[in-house]
Swiss-Prot record:
Protein name: Outer membrane lipoprotein omp19 homolog
Lineage: Bacteria, Pseudomonadati, Pseudomonadota, Alphaproteobacteria, Hyphomicrobiales
GO cellular component: cell outer membrane
Molecular function in Gene Ontology: endopeptidase inhibitor activity
Gene: omp19
Keyword 4Fe-4S in record: no
Keywords: Cell outer membrane, Lipoprotein, Membrane, Palmitate, Signal
Comp. bias regions, Low complexity: 32-44
UniProt topology in membrane: Lipid-anchor
Stretch forming the signal peptide: 1-20
Disulfide cross-links: none
Native organism: Mesorhizobium japonicum (strain LMG 29417 / CECT 9101 / MAFF 303099) (Mesorhizobium loti (strain MAFF 303099))
Pfam families attached to this UniProt entry: Inh (PF02974)
Lipidated positions per record (N-palmitoyl cysteine): C21
Residue ranges, compositional bias (Polar residues): 160-179
UniProt subcellular location: Cell outer membrane
Length: 179
């Protein structure tokens, strides 16, 4: 018996089509209907009166409350002065990924050694303002400075030893970088 290849292919396809039509896999989908939804509970909506607003004239909405007394705020020395014990920095020592803490909020900052503007490119990841605007960084002596897209300083930090930097943002928020 001599069978041609095309005849064998035709018989195989016919068998495949016939077997596909006889399956019951798809017929069971038509028989099952979803369970009916339970009706939402019927109830009555009630309303209450809002408390009356503060009496007019008792407070002036345009005035801020007085600042609390005896507050202690940590600060860095004025610009250009490094804290005692701060070490000289190099770009290689700063390059990498840092865990940043800005006023108690955490994020990550990447500081690769890719040249960008007057320093190196930087990339914040899920950072709060103003640190979310970091575009570059550079070191000068003992100081690490983080810059925005216009070259304005967003934060100045100094090495606190090991793999840690402490400083403050341009608006006075404390910031630290750790690895």
């Amino acid at each position: 018996m001599n069978f041609s290849k095309s005849g064998l292919v035709a018989v195989s396809l016919a068998a495949l089509v016939a077997s596909g039509c006889s399956t019951s896999r798809f017929s069971s989908m038509d028989d099952q209907q979803p369970a009916p939804l339970q009706p939402a509970p019927a109830g009555q909506v009630t309303s209450n009166q809002l408390p009356p607003p503060a009496s007019p004239g008792s407070t002036d909405p345009s005035k801020f409350p007085t600042a609390p007394a005896n507050t202690q705020v940590a600060s860095l020395p004025p610009d250009g002065q490094a804290p005692a014990g701060a070490s000289d920095l190099s770009a290689a020592a700063v390059a990498g990924v840092w865990n940043a803490s800005v006023s108690g909020q955490s994020c990550k900052i990447a500081t690769p050694q890719t040249k960008f503007g007057a320093g190196f490119r930087a990339g914040p990841l899920h950072c709060p303002a103003p640190i979310d605007g970091i575009k570059s960084w550079n070191v000068a002596g003992k100081q690490l400075t983080l810059y925005d897209e216009n070259g304005g300083s967003l934060a100045r930090l100094y090495s606190s030893g090991g793999s840690k930097f402490d400083g403050q943002t341009s608006n006075g928020q404390p910031i630290s970088l750790t690895r």
